[in-house]
């Protein structure tokens, strides 16, 4: 791997999901094991993901404080992600604890979730605007994420891509950062690009709404410099059941004239 490669490590779910950050022996032992793993990998950040079922009560916040006061993090930083709770809804007691222990507030910039406070490290996990992680961001959305991440005073920015096509989308943003331009994602433009994308796994016969549901989250090259969601174009189709990709393309040719 590259000499400048940096690991980040996600804490074992027993800490956050099974024992819900209670100051019990199992949690403290798991923390120690995770610290050892981070040390072996020279990881600067350990990510803690708290499930949406986690209740932010006075007791749970005290439990978190007790855990943090019982472990020696040394140089290891924690990035805490509270699933299902927006930054503005986090209790002041929790935010005070996070600041006291120099914890990074992890959010999803792709869904417009900014951290509750700034840290020297910005850590974001990107899932997109679809259901779960079924989404592919447009160039404009990636650019907006980049602008949001760069707008503060953070010295380091860590983006963890979780879109369905996470590797390709991360590479797209990297290309943009290096060249100032987003790359094409197919070998052609317009309907030919759409056909290339749909040919990957679209099933036929299929009704219009089923095509939009299964394929609409993807993007294609409308032009060399403009990528849009497949659903934006499929939405122009007449309501019908389509037997093959050629029939879809032929109908779209008519509505695009």
Which residues does each predicted region cover?
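Residues lining hydrophobic/aromatic ligand-binding pockets adjacent to catalytic sites
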Residues: 1-186
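Charged, amphipathic alpha-helical regulatory modules used
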Residues: 185-257
């Amino acid at each position: 791997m590259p000499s400048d490669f940096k690991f980040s490590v996600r804490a074992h779910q027993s800490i956050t999901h099974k024992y819900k950050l209670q100051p019990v022996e199992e949690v403290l032992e798991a923390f120690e094991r995770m610290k050892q793993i981070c040390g072996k990998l020279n990881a600067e950040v350990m990510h803690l993901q708290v499930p949406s079922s986690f209740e932010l009560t006075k007791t749970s916040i005290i439990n978190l404080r007790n855990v943090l006061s019982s472990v020696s993090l040394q140089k290891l930083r924690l990035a805490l992600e509270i699933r299902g709770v927006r930054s503005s809804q986090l209790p002041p007691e929790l935010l005070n604890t996070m600041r006291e222990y120099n914890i990074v507030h992890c959010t999803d910039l792709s869904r417009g979730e900014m951290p509750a406070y700034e840290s020297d490290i910005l850590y974001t996990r990107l899932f997109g605007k679809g259901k779960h992680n079924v989404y592919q961001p447009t160039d404009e959305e990636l650019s907006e994420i980049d602008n949001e991440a760069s707008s503060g005073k953070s010295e380091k920015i860590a983006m963890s891509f979780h879109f369905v096509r996470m590797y390709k989308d991360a590479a797209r943003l990297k290309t943009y950062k290096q060249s100032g331009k987003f790359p094409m994602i197919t070998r052609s433009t317009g309907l030919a690009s759409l056909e290339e994308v749909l040919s990957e796994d679209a099933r036929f016969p299929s009704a219009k709404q089923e095509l939009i549901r299964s394929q609409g989250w993807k993007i294609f090259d409308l032009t060399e410099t403009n990528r849009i969601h497949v659903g934006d174009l499929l939405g122009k189709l007449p309501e019908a059941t389509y037997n093959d990709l050629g029939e879809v393309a032929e109908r779209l040719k008519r509505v695009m004239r």
